From Swiss-Prot:
The gene is GRF3. It comes from Arabidopsis thaliana (Mouse-ear cress). GO terms for biological process: cellular response to nitrogen starvation; cellular response to phosphate starvation; cellular response to potassium ion starvation; cold acclimation; ethylene-activated signaling pathway; regulation of metabolic process; response to cold; response to freezing. The modification Phosphothreonine is found at T162, T210, T238. This is 14-3-3-like protein GF14 psi. Belongs to the 14-3-3 family. It comes from the Eukaryota. One of its GO terms (cellular component) is plant-type cell wall.
């Protein structure tokens, strides 16, 4: 068994054990060998799943803490607010470190070595996703910079996807889903978000009969998420508790 194969196997073990930080470490080692051989679809997905879990836990924590902070502020509990702000800062530094980690791997290794269109779109979409996660909690100039980097990455991915991938391809659909969420949540452009999501959905519907069996499940799942978001965004009930904007969680789709 080669070192690369061993790291992939260890990453799978770490995933089964739900030790995602270690899964990231193993897959980062694999990612740094792409100068010799590009990541397989399986390896690419393992890397994505590892980072998705590590970042996902912190994003969830940040949202909960931010919500508590708002409630305490509305009650005027200044002592509590000060404690919460410090704690939120700790979570934000973890988020920054994770995002910087994968963005460095993408920039230094994965994007330069990607040759098939599918790989390029996957990695550029991933780059956009992790800049978007930074934009979720950064403020001022840092938020603006993260948002601009997100837009550039998603736009580059979108140009390649439109030219090279079928409208029903799960990676193209996942990109459209996350790009539309970016317009809605980060740029506060609901019209652009709806337009992008609707276009992606309609283009896929028009070619649904060409969808292969292997990606049918993934593609139709992301199409459903696009439709869910469109329903949510076009309704007047976006402030209702329980309404949640959808991102695809599968690596072939979206982060």
């Amino acid at each position: 068994m080669s070192t690369r194969e061993e790291n992939v196997y260890m990453a799978k073990l770490a995933e089964q054990a739900e030790r995602y930080e270690e899964m990231v470490e193993f897959m980062e080692k694999v990612a740094k060998t792409v100068d010799v051989e590009e990541l397989s679809v399986e390896e690419r997905n393992l890397l994505s799943v590892a980072y998705k879990n590590v970042i996902g836990a912190r994003r969830a924590s940040w949202r909960i803490i931010s919500s508590i902070e708002q409630k305490e502020e509305s009650k005027g509990n200044e002592d509590h607010v000060a404690i919460i702000k410090d704690y939120r800062g700790k979570i934000e530094s973890e988020l920054s470190k994770i995002c910087d980690g994968i963005l460095n791997v993408l920039e230094a290794h994965l994007i330069p070595s990607a040759s098939p269109a599918e790989s390029k779109v996957f990695y550029l979409k991933m780059k956009g996703d992790y800049h978007r996660y930074l934009a979720e909690f950064k403020a001022g100039a840092e938020r603006k910079e993260a948002a601009e980097s997100t837009l550039v990455a998603y736009k580059s991915a979108s140009d390649i996807a439109t030219a090279e991938l079928a409208p029903t391809h799960p990676i193209r659909l996942g990109l459209a889903l996350n790009f539309s969420v970016f317009y809605y949540e980060i740029l506060n452009s609901p019209d652009r978000a709806c337009s992008l999501a609707k276009q992606a959905f309609d283009d896929a519907i028009a070619e649904l009969d060409t969808l292969g069996e292997e990606s049918y499940k993934d593609s139709t799942l992301i199409m459903q998420l696009l439709r869910d978001n469109l329903t949510l965004w076009t309704s007047d009930m976006t402030d209702e508790a329980g309404d949640e904007i959808k991102e695809a969680s599968k690596p072939d789709g979206a982060e």
